Amino acid sequence: MAGSVNKVILVGNLGADPEIRRLNSGDMVANLRIATSESWRDRQTGERKDRTEWHSVVIFNENLAKVAEQYLKKGAKVYIEGALQTRKWQDQNGNDRYSTEIVLQKFRGELQMLDSRSEGGEGRSFGGGGNRNQMSDYSGGGGDFGSSGPSSGSSGGFSRDLDDEIPF
């Protein structure tokens, strides 16, 4: 068993369009602001209360950054899986500042669009794991948080003429 686990899963809405930039190395990076909300009733007053948390997400996986740039817009509902990282930086006055972010590294992390406007309202899942040569993984089912398998060519999914016969 591993000594520790650093895994963050969020389901929320984008507060703004993704911010896309390039590092000095030429690698594409996407920055997202995701809102997660919870609501409850106050036991004493019966009043409905809401609280929204804002999360900074940084995508270093070039393929996932391209997906974010092309498909994600303000208000989009997404599933994000990454790791929590805190970085130290200095402001204009030389004071140390800290930022905690959910980071999707080159070969780790997942991004799924939950309210895709594609045919049939299906969500799309894009994973960054493994050493596959395919650009991204596609999951045709909106409720599946995992990956169904590598995409085949430009079709973006599995062939529709699969044999309907179950092999067992």
Swiss-Prot record:
Classification via InterPro entries: NA-bd_OB-fold, Primosome_PriB/ssb, ssDNA-bd
Residues spanned by motif Important for interaction with partner proteins: 163-168
Keywords: DNA damage, DNA recombination, DNA repair, DNA replication, DNA-binding
PROSITE patterns cross-referenced by the UniProt entry: SSB
General function of this protein: Plays an important role in DNA replication, recombination and repair. Binds to ssDNA and to an array of partner proteins to recruit them to their sites of action during DNA metabolism.
HAMAP family linked: SSB (MF_00984)
Full protein name: Single-stranded DNA-binding protein
Gene source species: Brucella suis biovar 1 (strain 1330)
Gene that specifies this protein: ssb
